[in-house]
């Protein structure tokens, strides 16, 4: 069965912060580390066979490095996807797990090299496989399903209380 995915996305710094600590990775597109978001709503269409992956990152600052953490995760996903797209076809859950490990390692390595103790990013990701969609999230970036005119949260927050 062939299906297609219509999608739209945007990214905006908001009115409070001078810099944008968010980023995304949408079928190979992501923003540079220093950005003010997108100026438009971007749209696209992908066939299931192309195994599209989409992710959002919400950088956490501490030492004004939230934008770097979000970019590092996006950039890491870009390289991981290119090198491991075959894994997504054969073992999508393993792909998501390994992608998350890879992104986390990139952020941790940078923080260690730069002696930054408080930097990180949350993440929500969806990958479309042959017959199913696979989701994962880290932190409090949420994934919702829209069905029959209603949104319902399908991810679970990972936060300390």
What spans do the regions from the language model cover?
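PP2C/PPM-type serine/threonine phosphatase catalytic domain
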Residues: 1-161
């Amino acid at each position: 069965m062939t299906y297609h995915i219509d999608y739209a996305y945007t990214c905006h710094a908001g009115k409070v912060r001078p810099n944008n600590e968010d980023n995304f990775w949408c079928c190979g597109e992501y923003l540079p580390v220093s950005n003010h978001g997108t100026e438009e709503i971007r749209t696209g269409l992908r066939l299931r066979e192309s195994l599209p992956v989409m992710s959002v990152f919400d950088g956490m600052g501490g030492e004004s490095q939230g934008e770097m953490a979000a970019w590092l995760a996006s950039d890491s996903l870009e390289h991981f996807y290119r090198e491991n797209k075959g894994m997504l076809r054969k073992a999508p859950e393993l792909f998501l797990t390994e992608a998350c490990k890879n992104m986390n390692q990139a952020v941790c390595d940078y923080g260690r090299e730069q002696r930054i103790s408080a930097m990180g990013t949350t993440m929500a990701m969806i990958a479309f496989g042959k017959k199913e969609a696979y989701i994962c999230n880290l932190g409090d970036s949420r994934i919702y399903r829209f069905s029959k005119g209603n949104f319902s949260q399908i991810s679970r927050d990972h936060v300390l209380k």
